[in-house]
């Protein structure tokens, strides 16, 4: 048995090295090319070669029968190996081609849509992809038929999925009312950009100051940031350095948003490589990823520490001026909420609007997966709900298809994860309120320049499990926060 577990670890290590090289390739492609990122199938082809070997097949069938003998870490390794095996097996069944070829085709068609070209040939592939998802999860969950909720439970865990799914559904009407009130009053209270119209150089200076605060968490690695010609931000790390490519520079607020999202990824990288995660499940780690990234994205709304960084670096003569600090903070939070689009990106960066798009994305993905409509109807379903919920016309007639880019990576349930992450931030009230908020310690260390003492451990995860009473506070505090920065 020991020999088999060693073989399993070695095989998974080879796969992880290939994944790392693939990530490196994507990062440097985005760094130098203005075009959307094509799918490089070479790495997946090598993985498919490893998976199709007699050794890999034997290990998979062996540990299917003896998975109870594996440690938690070894179970993670087996899950990774088995996931690749199922991808390869059912891709051949559904697409009549290897998984690498199928994803290459899906990605190429998605890129055509980004360029404004016809994607009519994508829809038959999406029907096949849905069938692929069903077969994969039927085998993985040992069920004859699977529903969308079954998949979410397998990805994020039963307890968290049931709790957040219920409250996401219950909160949709409240979010819609708040959004409509928000857009009705927003134009009349417009705050012009007077101080935050920063140059690319000044923006880089401020972001590096923020990075220095965060870097105390990753003491052994240097963090470097840059702007590239590609609109899609990427992250890459080696043993010495973490590289953050923020994409195209347009303005300070958008750059800050991208930087904070990638900082969330940095914390996750450190978190996943720490010893505390070895005995934790993949479902818990996935949930923590969305929670921490969501939290970092909303930092300008939760603390004035970022405003202090801006004033200290760009306006040093106004360091002690509390009125000036408040003015900058008001300008920052206002425009951080109102920013909508960045060039060719199909995401918006107004947090409230983006949350509502996640509501729509979740609804559509569930109905699509459960076969309530055909893939050809995806764009119509999206456009209908964007107009109904947001009172807006989509900037592209195929936006509803392009929003689900995670499907081209073989991923599902991302919108639910992001919404759950946002909800978890407010589960116990806001950090400044007299409640034990899960991220209070982070903000305390962040504000005091002592972030090196903070780690996102699994005590944090246990605190993020919402209970009924804390949920009742969530909506009230969130509404107060948005009204404050309206």
Task: Give the positions of each predicted feature.
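N-terminal helix-rich structural modules
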Residues: 1-155, 460-474, 481-484
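Contiguous, non-catalytic segments that form substrate-binding/exosite surfaces or channel walls
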Residues: 103-254, 455-457, 461-486
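Acidic/His metal-coordination segments adjacent to aromatic residues that form catalytic metal sites
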Residues: 238-252, 274-283, 338-345, 400-407
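Short alpha-helix carrying the canonical HExxH Zn2+-binding catalytic motif
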Residues: 252-267
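Post-HEXXH active-site segment of zinc metalloproteases
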Residues: 253, 269-294, 308-312
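Long, amphipathic alpha-helical stalk/connector segments used for oligomerization, subunit docking
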Residues: 302-406
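C-terminal substrate/ligand-recognition segments
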Residues: 410-429
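An amphipathic alpha-helical core segment
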Residues: 423-464
